[in-house]
């Protein structure tokens, strides 16, 4: 966990302001959910066997005996709010976005922190592959808006529960042959949730995983048609992507489309955004109404790092006007002038002391665009 201080926070504001503009252009509206949720929400939504639930959540018992957890991700919370507040009764697809802190007890590494920030969006109420393409387009537009270059979009389909069931059986059969050569986590996953083996990041396991069957060869007709349509709609938008059959993401709720954006500035763990479709999540959380959805989350810490390391933006704080008053009467007059300038949208600083040389040195250090010197003659005129 860490503090974020100026001028670094200028980068964060730049990214968040751009995200809000892009989301608004696609008719998304902000949702704010609690940082604390009942633990069972994430166990049911994210998946009992996922690393997030088994290893990474900050969970504690409240005074009344209930189990609470600092949210490790936001999608489950958004769907809970969607169900609880009957947002399915509102017209059209519900398009929601969020910006805020999440918490996971992860192993510290480059760009990953135990309190981290996510920017994300969820579109709930449609199974259309056109919506999948629109959501992915929105991500690409955001990255273009902040002038992030060198990113790559990865795409896959993990199928529906039916075709995934057949694939899991085949995968479990193949994993039984190679499991002794895999890491301890993969050996455990091979028994509990074989699809998760494909999400392994251990370098030594990759040649074995690459030789495993591909889920794209086991999609049912409906999932194949859906995935083909997503690719077609992305191509119509001139959005470049790369098919990655091993892209399953680390959460159990995903169905059909999964996608990820990677950036070379981050090294081996190079993901800055991940998302996918979750057509059964609402029902898993207790909804009696089928509410298919798709969404994504951007790791803001890692995105900011990518921006800074690619040197595509300078984020020094902008001071428009520095005012240097000479004497007490000028200081009092400058307070009124500064107020009017601030009301017009300018960033203004008034020198706290009356020494001109020191004031000009400070104006230079603050990189002010303009310096205004006010003395008795200026007041008189």
Model-derived regions: residue spans:
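TRNA-recognition modules of translation machinery and tRNA-sensing kinases, especially anticodon-binding
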Residues: 1-381
């Amino acid at each position: 966990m860490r503090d974020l201080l100026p001028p670094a926070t200028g980068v964060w504001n730049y990214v968040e302001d751009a995200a809000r503009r892009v989301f608004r252009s696609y008719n998304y509206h902000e949702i704010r959910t609690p940082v604390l949720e009942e633990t069972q929400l994430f166990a049911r939504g994210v998946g009992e066997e996922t690393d997030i639930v088994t290893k990474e959540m900050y969970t504690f018992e409240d005074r009344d005996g209930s189990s609470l957890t600092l949210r490790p991700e936001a999608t489950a919370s958004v769907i809970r709010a969607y169900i609880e507040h009957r947002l399915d009764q509102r017209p059209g697809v519900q398009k929601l976005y969020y910006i805020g802190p999440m918490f996971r007890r992860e192993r510290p590494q480059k760009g990953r922190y135990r309190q981290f920030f996510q920017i994300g969006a969820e579109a709930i109420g449609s199974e259309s592959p056109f919506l999948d393409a629109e959501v992915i387009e929105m991500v690409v537009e955001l990255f273009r808006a902040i002038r992030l270059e060198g990113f790559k979009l990865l795409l896959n389909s993990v199928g529906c529960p039916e075709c995934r069931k057949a694939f899991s059986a085949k995968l479990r059969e193949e994993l039984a042959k190679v499991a002794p050569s895999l890491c301890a986590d993969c050996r455990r996953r091979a028994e509990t949730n074989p699809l998760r083996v494909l999400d392994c990041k251990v370098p030594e396991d990759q040649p074995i995983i690459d030789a495993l069957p591909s889920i794209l060869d086991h999609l049912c007709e409906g999932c194949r048609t859906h995935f083909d349509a997503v690719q077609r709609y992305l191509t119509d938008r001139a959005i470049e992507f790369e098919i990655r059959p091993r892209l399953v993401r680390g959460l159990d709720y995903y169905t059909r489309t999964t996608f990820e954006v990677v950036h070379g500035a981050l090294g081996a763990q190079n993901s800055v955004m991940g998302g996918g479709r979750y057509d059964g999540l609402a029902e898993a959380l207790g909804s009696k109404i089928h509410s298919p959805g798709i969404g994504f989350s951007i790791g803001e810490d890692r995105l900011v790092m990518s921006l800074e390391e690619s040197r595509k933006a300078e984020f020094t704080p902008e001071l428009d006007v520095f005012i240097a008053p000479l004497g007490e009467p000028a200081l009092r007059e400058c307070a009124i002038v500064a107020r009017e300038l601030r009301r017009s949208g300018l960033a203004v600083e008034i020198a706290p002391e009356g020494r001109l040389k020191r004031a000009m040195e400070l104006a230079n250090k603050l990189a002010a665009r303009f310096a205004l010197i006010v003395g008795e003659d200026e007041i008189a005129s």
